[in-house]
């Protein structure tokens, strides 16, 4: 019994861990805009798997088309919210918009919306950015542990 135990300990102690190999960053292949058009009901914003926050732009909120509150073809951002449902086909969560504004707004009910250019919009897993035209602001959203 002692010999078996000694042999087992010798074998265990002589084992070396496998060499660490370089890990490839597969997030470079992710296109977070997939599903943001044609009723895919997904959003490109920043989120972490199983995280409590899914921060993303809102480009509309009326009707079934805007279940995720983002449609790729839109040219106006209404604001940014902290919770989104992805691919559900229904709206929920009662989001509160956050939007940078400057100056006095004559019509507060819609004056907070801003145009943005698709060539100045980008997203990767955990990161979203867009440059707003009015006010001239670069919005950046991130998610991390």
Where are the model-predicted features located?
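Bacterial N-terminal signal peptides
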Residues: 2-10
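Bacterial Sec-dependent signal peptides at the C-terminal "C-region" and cleavage site
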Residues: 11-23
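Accessory carbohydrate-recognition regions in carbohydrate-active enzymes
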Residues: 20-145
